[in-house]
Amino acid sequence: FLHPSMLAFDAPSREECCADRSRSNIPQQALVLLNDPTYVEAARSLAGRTLAECQGSAEERVAWAWRQVLQRLPRVEEMEAVMPLVREHLAHYRATPAAADELLKTGYAPPPSGIDKAELAAWTHVARVLLNLHETITRN
């Protein structure tokens, strides 16, 4: 059995050894990364770590998460692109707590306790952006 998300990324069957994998970039891969509960849960986990381990400002948290994912700090234009996203999603989830609850119940692992749900949901979206950057997905 090969998980459907692995099929989207051209994973070989596990029945035999494969020394070289083909590389592709197709729209279905983006859909998997954005919609598969596994990847949403991974983003939520990164968001939880960001909020728990970085007690600074929103800008400092973006920089911390960026460094965790990409091993570098964001450039000025990248920070300028992400900060409105942080504010927009935070306002949205503070206004609609039910939407935050819906997002945070995705996956098997429970959300971290002691973190504001609206904040965790907003930072989950920021983490999804970081985890879906071309630079994150591709090695070269």
What label would you give each PLM region?
Residues 51-124:
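C-terminal structured "cap/appendage" subdomains that terminate the fold
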